[in-house]
């Protein structure tokens, strides 16, 4: 429940930030235009992002004939989660990782790298795919699409304000110093909120995945393995498309500096600790 409340508050925050910047550029009209612009971008992302992401990673759809064990695992977990069967994809990459995409549970897809199938045991793989199906069940793909779109739009509007200035409610030019401050600080604030939402949704997917599989310990050991192996194996497709990093079960990017604030994922140690506590107590709340 805490993660859902936190997500709602952060979503409200990023929406407010977006509208305020629109207002600084052009008063009420600016806010209206900004909101309509965000809605248009969200609509496009909502309907087409899954196809774009799968194409970026050259993901190949599989079925019960081409990947029988993996496909049956996903089907069994989808049944346990009371979800429609998603499309199942494999990505020919050594880096161990997985993600879910799709605009809703009826149009969902899950994908895993060939590397993760080699690294994890069957029980651990069940934990990972249960985590991805929890994202589908919680409609996190929609949430991440909205936040990523709005964070990008905030940056674009802030740059517009810096280079072209803004207008107040009466049409007078806005304070240029305020415009520069907005251009510098608003994109950072938007990114911070976006990352915080992503981390909250990862915690919630860990909890939901543990409920679906009934085995939080296996997800914990899977995260530990993925973290250790991924550190030494570059994920080239993810490095080429860093905006998709938040979709993965483990952050595939290798960067430093202010990592906790700008990371799309919580610290692996904290995720493991929470899952082990679930395993110890048998409670998933």
Swiss-Prot record:
InterPro entries reported in the protein's UniProt record: HtpX_protease, Pept_M48_protease_HtpX, Peptidase_M48
Q: What is the annotated localization of this protein?
A: Cell inner membrane
Cite the active-site annotation. Answer: 132
Is Zinc among this UniProt entry's keywords?
yes
Gene Ontology BP annotations: proteolysis
Q: Binding positions for Zn(2+)?
A: 131, 135, 202
What keywords appear on the UniProt entry?
Cell inner membrane, Cell membrane, Hydrolase, Membrane, Metal-binding, Metalloprotease, Protease, Transmembrane, Transmembrane helix, Zinc
- What CDD domains does the entry give? M48B_HtpX_like (cd07336)
Q: Return the cofactor note field.
A: Binds 1 zinc ion per subunit.
Chief site of localization: membrane
Q: Which cofactor does it need?
A: Zn(2+)
Q: Per UniProt, what is the membrane topology?
A: Multi-pass membrane protein
Q: Name one Pfam family in it.
A: Peptidase_M48
Q: Name one GO molecular function term.
A: zinc ion binding
Q: Which residues cross the membrane?
A: 7-27, 30-50, 146-166, 177-197
Q: Which protein family is named in the record? A: Belongs to the peptidase M48B family.
Enumerate the HAMAP family for this protein: Pept_M48_protease_HtpX
NCBIfam families reported for this sequence: PRK01345.1 (NF002363), PRK03001.1 (NF002826)
Record protein name field: Protease HtpX homolog
What is the originating organism of this protein? Burkholderia ambifaria (strain MC40-6)
**Species lineage:** Bacteria, Pseudomonadati, Pseudomonadota, Betaproteobacteria, Burkholderiales
Gene assigned in the entry: htpX
């Amino acid at each position: 429940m805490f993660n859902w409340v936190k997500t709602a508050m952060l979503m409200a925050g990023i929406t407010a930030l977006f509208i305020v910047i629109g207002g600084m550029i052009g008063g009420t009209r600016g806010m209206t235009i900004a909101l309509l612009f965000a809605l248009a971008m969200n609509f496009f992302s909502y309907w087409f992002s899954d196809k774009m992401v799968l194409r970026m990673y050259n993901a190949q759809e599989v079925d019960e004939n081409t990947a029988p064990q993996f496909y049956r695992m996903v089907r069994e977990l989808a049944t346990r989660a009371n979800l429609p069967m998603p499309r199942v994809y494999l990505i020919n990459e050594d880096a161990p990782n997985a993600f879910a995409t799709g605009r809703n549970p009826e149009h969902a897809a899950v994908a895993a790298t060939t590397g993760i199938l080699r690294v994890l045991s069957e029980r651990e793989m069940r934990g990972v795919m249960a985590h991805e199906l929890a994202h589908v069940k919680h409609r996190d793909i929609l949430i991440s699409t909205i936040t990523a779109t709005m964070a990008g739009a905030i940056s674009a509007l802030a740059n517009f304000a810096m280079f072209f200035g803004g207008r107040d409610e009466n049409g007078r030019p806005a304070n240029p110093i305020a415009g520069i401050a907005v251009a510098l600080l608003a994109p950072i604030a938007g990114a911070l909120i976006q990352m915080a939402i992503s981390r909250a949704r990862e915690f919630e997917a860990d909890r939901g995945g543990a409920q679906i599989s009934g085995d939080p310990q296996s997800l914990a050991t899977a995260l530990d393995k993925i973290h250790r192996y991924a550190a030494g194996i570059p994920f080239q497709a993810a490095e080429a498309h860093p905006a998709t990093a938040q979709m993965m079960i483990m952050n595939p990017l290798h960067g430093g500096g202010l990592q906790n604030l700008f990371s799309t994922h919580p610290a692996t140690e904290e995720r493991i600790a929470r899952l082990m506590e679930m395993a110890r107590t048998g409670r998933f709340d």
